[in-house]
Amino acid sequence: MHSEKKKNRFEIDMCNGSIMNKLISFSIPLMISGILQLAFNAVDIVVVGRFSGSESLAAVGSTTALINVFTNLFIGISLGANVLAARFYAAGREKEMSETVHTAITFAIISGVVMALVGLFFSRGALELMGTPDNVINLSTLYMKIYFLGMPFFMLYNYGAAILRAVGDTKRPLLFLIVAGVINACLNLLLVIAFHLGVAGVAIATVTAQFVSCVLVLRCLYKSDSSYQLRFSKLMIKKVYLGQIFQVGIPAGIQSTVINFSNVLLQSSVNSFGSVAMAGYTAANNIFGFLYASINAVTQACMSFTSQNYGVGKWKRMDRVLVDCLILSTTIALILGGGAYLFGPELLKIYTDDSQVISCGMEILLYTTVTYFLCGWMDLFPGSLRGMGKSIVPMILSVIGTVGTRIVWIFGIFPRFRSLKILFISYPVSWIITIILQVICFIFVRRIVYAPLKKREAAV
């Protein structure tokens, strides 16, 4: 089959031409998009930290890991939609592509409503299980309940953007997020400073921004004249495609959810040091998040490029995609990670002027930013395998290497040498162990996946 031709200037041909140049063209808008999504929460934190006090700062920041646990399963499933859509698009299978798009968007609506209900009814209980201090739990609960009311918009944007990424379009989702980000920032200032709504104000601003980005991405799909055109009358669940989406997406979502559960345990350990350490972790974790968004863009590129080339049987190009992604991810992580630590005090002052909070934040940054290139390596090998449709074994190994190591560390080593330093050394240790497991897995699975591709190539 012949791949579907590009329909507009926003799409990228992933199956021909220079790989590195196209990876950069694909990754940069996606990187900025990820940073802007984090900026929604960062602006919330900056505004409440500056204008509502340290308790409000701790309240908003302490919800991050818990929100990720609730949402990452469904966001992971969107990766399955991305992989399947990329494969069908590259192979020129327009009917299958269209049905995949409508199945994915329908599932996004359903999952968004489910998450809104979960957040509304279970937020406080989950925060209590985390040991959230009494002086911030009411504010944390209020923030989470309002935030989760926007889950349908959040899910629709992410699934719509996953479809656009599948065809190489990362520029328009970036434009949509810029618009939403400006709205978010303006509403934060208005609702918190002018109307004194505190954490409720920043949550309302975030939900409004999510609604705007959702409308824009759906409009983009609706206006398309390609096989990924959206028609609301065609929304349905096709079991065959939902099953294939789940095959890749559910393991990815479970992996992300379980890893974030380990971060919830880590948040609980930080909570035991009091509100100063909580605020320091909140600020440092936001900087840490920007680094992850940057290298995760390369992982997303690896998955999309691999999936399209798998769809047309170009196994040699799949290998080159992984190598170029490793080079690009390492370069980005070393530059941004080193910069984040060198300018750490200045970056932390964006969130707070409290010297004790900044000191805690710097201690955390030392063990998470300088070694962050390891996190990129850890994600790229399973990202490549997911592009080939193989997701279960990488998920199991990631859970064993990352979560298993951190649980042993938190409950075994940390109580004996109780300090923030010892707590956060668990990050690079878990990354190294997981890399070793994932490389071994990649070598074996690659042989199995490539065998029929090589036979098909030899027969031509």
Model-assigned labels for residue ranges:
Residues 1-27, 85-150, 194-250, 306-371, ...:
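Short alpha-helical transmembrane segments in multi-pass integral membrane proteins
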Residues 16, 20-39, 43, 66-73, ...:
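Residue-level signal for short hydrophobic patches within transmembrane helices
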Residues 25-44, 146, 180, 209-213, ...:
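Transmembrane helical elements of multi-pass membrane transporters/channels
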Residues 26, 30-38, 75, 107-116, ...:
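Hydrophobic alpha-helical transmembrane segments in multi-pass membrane proteins
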Residues 35, 39-58, 127-134, 190-197, ...:
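Helix-terminus/linker motif at the lipid-water interface of multi-pass membrane proteins
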Residues 57-117, 154-173, 280-338, 342-344, ...:
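Small-residue-rich hydrophobic transmembrane alpha-helices
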Residues 69-72, 184-188, 214-218, 290-293, ...:
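Hydrophobic transmembrane alpha-helices of multi-pass small-molecule transporters
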Residues 78, 147-165, 173-181, 202-215, ...:
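Short runs within selected transmembrane alpha-helices of multi-pass transporters and secretion channels
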